[in-house]
């Protein structure tokens, strides 16, 4: 239940008037004997035509009365609004829980920290509709925007509609004009996973993904470059359907000694399924993930995975937005490195054979 409490206080001239518990510019102006325009100009930093003494009087009373400005109005009225929009694709695979996804939450958290450092304001939107993005940007007079989770071959229409700088995470398009594409090296992540599995004697490796395009395809192709016999299994996005799918294909899955999941979420979900059918990880089957979300360390057993640096990408995104705004860059494709993090979900097949 929401309760709105209104406390009207009317006091004689020289004291404060409050409506709804909020101090107004008009109240400050009345107490000082100034115009509301003068007080407003001081609040907005437009003090060139105002005496230092008046500025000081206004600022002191604002502080004394604990005046809280309407920041939204101030920011929207400025050319440099300091508002950075972050748009997340509301993909069906998230099943209505987009912001609960570990990769998404880690990415947003890293961006929030970088924006705090840069004195920017983060405004978040979750949508699956392209048409909502330009509308969102113009409605809030944004300084720039970061798009996450979209895998489209052609951003041309969006570029034409967007008149602000924007950065795309894993955009898979030709960068030009007012945008920069920041990717992690998905192919090399697959290469590192494949090389690691091969060094431990694995030859029959299965890659699981809910699609065979964009970054997931690159991760699989990297794996296959190291292990030519590797196969791709496209799995259902919905968890309940996916569990049924695993059960129906269990005998086929058991033919492989290791599984490379294109995300930590799918890796951990798969391991939970294996546990439910009596398959032990890593004794009976090895598993590698991708992303290195926080839960990897706490998972049982701790998950071996390919790490991408969320903080590095967020810092790069803010840096590129600034450069785009200053006209210093445009049309860039930036590739960030990934690293294999060894934990406890991969068995050494060669060592196991020697012991037997």
State where each predicted segment sits.
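Short beta-strand elements in bilobed, periplasmic/extracellular small-molecule ligand-binding domains
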Residues: 111-126, 204-207, 223-243
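Hydrophobic alpha-helical segments within soluble ligand-binding/sensing domains
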Residues: 180-207, 241-248, 267, 306-326
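Flexible loop/turn connectors
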Residues: 247-356
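An alpha-beta-alpha
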Residues: 191-231, 332-345
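Short acidic/polar active-site loop segments enriched in Thr and Asp
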Residues: 35, 82, 143, 202-204, ...
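Alpha-helical recognition/docking segments in bacterial nutrient-uptake
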Residues: 1-20, 79, 83-195, 249-255, ...
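N-terminal helix-turn-helix DNA-binding module of bacterial transcription factors
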Residues: 2-80
């Amino acid at each position: 239940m929401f309760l709105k409490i209104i406390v009207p206080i009317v006091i004689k001239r020289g004291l404060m008037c409050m409506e709804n518990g909020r101090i107004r510019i008009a109240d400050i102006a009345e107490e000082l004997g100034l115009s509301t325009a003068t007080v407003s100009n001081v609040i907005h930093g437009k003090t060139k035509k105002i005496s230092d003494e008046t500025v000081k009087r206004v600022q002191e009373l604002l502080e004394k009365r604990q005046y809280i400005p309407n920041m939204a109005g101030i920011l929207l009225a400025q050319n440099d609004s300091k508002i950075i929009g972050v748009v997340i694709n509301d993909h069906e695979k998230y099943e209505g829980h987009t912001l609960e996804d570990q990769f998404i939450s880690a990415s947003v958290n890293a961006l929030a920290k970088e924006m705090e450092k840069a004195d920017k304001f983060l405004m978040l939107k979750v949508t699956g509709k392209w048409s909502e993005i330009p509308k969102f940007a113009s409605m809030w007079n944004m300084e720039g925007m970061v798009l996450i989770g979209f895998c489209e071959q052609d951003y041309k229409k969006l570029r034409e509609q967007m008149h602000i700088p924007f950065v795309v995470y894993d955009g898979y398009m030709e960068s030009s004009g007012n945008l920069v594409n920041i990717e992690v090296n998905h192919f090399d992540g697959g290469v590192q996973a494949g090389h690691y599995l091969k060094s431990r004697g694995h030859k029959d490796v299965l890659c699981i993904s809910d699609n065979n395009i964009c970054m997931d395809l690159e991760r699989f192709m990297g794996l296959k470059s190291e292990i030519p016999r590797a196969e791709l299994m496209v799995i259902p996005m919905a968890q309940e359907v996916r569990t049924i799918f695993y059960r129906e294909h269990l005998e086929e899955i058991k033919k492989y000694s290791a599984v490379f999941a294109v995300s930590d979420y799918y890796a951990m979900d798969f391991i939970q399924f294996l546990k439910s059918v009596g398959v032990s990880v890593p004794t009976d089957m090895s598993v590698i993930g991708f992303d290195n979300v926080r839960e990897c360390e706490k998972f049982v057993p701790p998950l071996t995975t390919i790490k991408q640096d969320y903080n590095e990408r967020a810092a790069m995104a803010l840096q590129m937005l600034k450069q785009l705004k200053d006209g210093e860059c445009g049309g860039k494709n930036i590739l960030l490195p990934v690293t294999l993090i060894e934990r406890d979900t991969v068995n050494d097949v060669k060592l196991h054979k020697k012991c037997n």
